[in-house]
Design a protein with these regions (language model features):
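Feature for intrinsically disordered/low-complexity regulatory segments and propeptides
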Residues: 1-160, 169
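Intrinsic disorder/low-complexity polar-acidic segments
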Residues: 142, 149-256
Length: 256
């Protein structure tokens, strides 16, 4: 059984209530911390590192499983204050951005060399980083400038979206939801709006002899967001009912 601290953890939802409760709990258990970039310190966390063998160096709620999983994945830890936290793979891109370095060769370096390079670069910058600590690991290292990044709690986004659907498209039905450490998504169908929204599409398909396909089509929306910098908060209109949902037009997006 997967543990929430594992980088590969993911879960699905069959009801909006379950998805909302999951993200409310996630928000309560998450920490957003501001630290000077030059106060951050990176250490290697693979099986050969000294930190791997000293679990007492980690923050009180960091489990042995979280340390072991990190040693198998990114292999780095961050010292925040006096405690160390494993770094999740989702934080790698934003950590490089705070150090202002990039390159395909970096992942190929030993964890000791990579940590040393990161520390040398991080020490130069006095601006702030906005750190997300979630499920026992540093999950993101965003810019601390509010112009660059704003926290948009997923549970609040879901509530706002549900209110909008109830107001504008009454009768909308939650279809499915998904969440992992990088991304959260959900989809709804709008059976009450089918006749109004799909009249033109159905007429075209029926004229082409695709009556069965026309009868299966259902308008819907797909919601996607991320706390780790993978995506903005966006809602896309969809045609559902076929094997693969079809995007209609563009999307409404709000950057974090």
């Amino acid at each position: 059984m997967q543990k929430t601290c594992e980088d590969s953890y993911s879960t699905t939802f069959c009801s909006f209530e379950d998805m909302q409760k999951y993200h409310e709990d996630l928000t309560l258990g998450s920490q957003w911390l501001r630290y000077k970039i030059n106060e951050l310190h990176i250490e290697p966390l693979d099986r050969t590192s000294s930190l791997y063998g000293t679990p007492s160096s980690f923050a009180p709620r960091v489990s042995v499983e979280a340390v072991e999983d990190t040693a198998q994945n990114l292999g780095l830890a961050m010292r925040i204050g006096t405690d160390y936290y494993p770094i999740r793979t989702t934080a790698y891109k934003s950590l490089l951005a705070r150090a202002k370095i990039s390159g395909t060769v970096l992942p190929k370096l030993s964890r000791e060399k990579l940590a040393r390079i990161l520390n040398d670069c991080l020490s130069i910058y006095s601006s702030e980083a906005l750190l997300l600590i979630r499920n026992e690991k540093v999950s993101a290292a965003h810019s601390g400038n509010p112009v660059d990044y704003s926290v948009l709690p997923i549970d609040e986004l879901l509530k706002a979206l549900m209110r909008g659907l109830d107001d504008r498209f009454p009768g909308s039905k939650f279809q499915s939801g998904y969440s992992d450490h990088a991304l959260t998504s959900a989809s709804w169908t709008m059976p009450g709006q089918k006749e109004k929204l799909l009249d033109t599409y159905e007429k075209v398909l029926i004229a082409q002899g695709k009556t069965t396909m026309a009868s299966k089509l259902m308008p819907g929306i797909r919601f996607v967001t991320s706390d780790t910098g993978v995506a903005s908060a966006k809602v896309s209109a969809m045609l559902m009912g076929t094997q693969y949902p079809i995007h209609i037009g563009g999307c409404v997006a709000v950057d974090h």
